[in-house]
Amino acid sequence: MKSYFVTMGFNETFLLRLLNETSAQKEDSLVIVVPSPIVSGTRAAIESLRAQISRLNYPPPRIYEIEITDFNLALSKILDIILTLPEPIISDLTMGMRMINTLILLGIIVSRKRFTVYVRDEGGGSRVISFNDNTIRALMRDYSREEMKLLNVLYETKGTGITELAKMLDKSEKTLINKIAELKKFGILTQKGKDRKVELNELGLNVIKLNKSVIESSKSSEELVKENKGKEVNIPY
């Protein structure tokens, strides 16, 4: 079971597309939040949605109207709804008022629930991007200095094999394999080829950008690699 949590404007097309592309089932939950008082255009779109949902075997919508006069009061109402919903939560930020969509996005993130959020081309094109709770968790995580040294070596070398990485960091291959497996769970590393070369993906590169201060406060990985050629460099995990 999954929960759809969205707002809605004057057209139900994007929502129907979301339900179709994510294989919505009747037992799922569909919650639509709209600003109060609801306007006639949105009301008409909701009625059209109800008519189509009844024949498509999608979940019936529950409609919530909320007043938006204060950020914290509005966010509180959003959280009251989100926190009761089963996971994962699915949302599409292409529909309705930007103000409501902003509150929905913030509410979903701070709720710490599992989620996937979609953003589509408002012009009706095929472009769509998405991200989920794993993405946010990877970006917001407090990485240790030692983890950042490892990630920065991968950044500076543009990826390397386990054996070479172990030599650079003066660590056993087993230790690094375990650490890399741990970091891969956050979706920031990939391993390719016969030699299982370890590389940062785009998400990993964003983690590097967000943690530059951690990297710059310690020796650069370039210096680390150079020093390791002549003497031992011990970096405890």
Swiss-Prot record:
The keyword Disulfide bond does not apply. The keyword DNA-binding applies. CDD domains: CasRa_I-A. GO terms for molecular function: DNA binding. CRISPR (clustered regularly interspaced short palindromic repeat) is an adaptive immune system that provides protection against mobile genetic elements (viruses, transposable elements and conjugative plasmids). CRISPR clusters contain spacers, sequences complementary to antecedent mobile elements, and target invading nucleic acids. CRISPR clusters are transcribed and processed into CRISPR RNA (crRNA). This is CRISPR locus-related putative DNA-binding protein Csa3. GO terms for biological process: defense response to virus. It comes from Saccharolobus solfataricus (strain ATCC 35092 / DSM 1617 / JCM 11322 / P2). Belongs to the CRISPR-associated Csa3 family. Keywords: Antiviral defense, DNA-binding. SUPFAM superfamilies: Winged helix' DNA-binding domain. It comes from the Archaea. Disulfide bonds: none annotated. Pfam families: Csa3_N, HVO_A0114.
